[in-house]
Amino acid sequence: MVYGNSMIVLRLVLYQSMVNYRIENSFGHVQSYPLPTPSMIRGMAHDLLDLKEYFPLRISIQGNFESAVVNMQRVMKFDRDPKSRPNNPYLVEVGTSVKTATHSISFVDNLINCELILHIAFKNNEEYTKNLHQQVFQKTVVLGRNDDIARVDFNKTKLTEVKLGKSPERLKYSAYILKDIAHKNQIGGTHYKLPFKYEPVKDFNENRIFNFVECVYVSKDEQLEEEFYIDEDNLPVSFLELDNEF
């Protein structure tokens, strides 16, 4: 997919000591993607900019982690409407109200010492990209669960120009690469259909209808033979985006 010979993007470098990028519909054993999904990053970017509606963007996701562990946690879930479980004897006082609740044991995958290299560009709106660059220096960045705070590397995070070219080096980080590009480069990996964004919902009772992007999780040290976008520090950039968005 060709966007032009060059463009300005935000390169956001993050570190998380322990994080879970939850795979949807994993319960009991909460599994994690190896890298955050486009939907998580889209939500993070829109939240940092206080955007109340969706604006199209391109996202490149790469990173490494040292290891993975499984934590055992006790999970408590409170009913939004206590009347929905009239026979539930488990009552918990929350503030000034009493809630019915359920509790159970859950196993959660956690990635350890995760370093992320994200390239983000709003489509046809360079001003939003520049504003996002300002906000990551001023606000707390959260990616993954609500308590998965990320540390921003202020020295490596910057606005950068990406251009079409060939990287002479192998991949330094594992990355999500569009399926067609992975096939052209004859690179194998784990195939994912990742959530990118969901259609607006009115309340918690409505199901989120997601739009997905097909990609391959490619391990570091692979060589990219085809022409690729490269940033100013010679890092390859593989944009994920939804088709027909402007």
Residue map of PLM features:
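Internal, well-folded beta-alpha domain core
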Residues: A68-F246
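Short, structured patches in soluble enzyme cores that scaffold and shape functional sites
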Residues: L14-Q16, G63, I120-F122
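A general structural signal for short secondary-structure junctions and capping/turn motifs
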Residues: M1-V2, L48-E53, V108-L111
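Glycine/small-residue-rich interface belts in oligomeric ring/scaffold proteins
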Residues: I23-L91
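Extracellular structured ligand-interaction cores
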Residues: M7, P56-R58, N113-E115
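N-terminal, Lys/Arg- and Ser/Thr-rich interaction peptides
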Residues: V2-S26
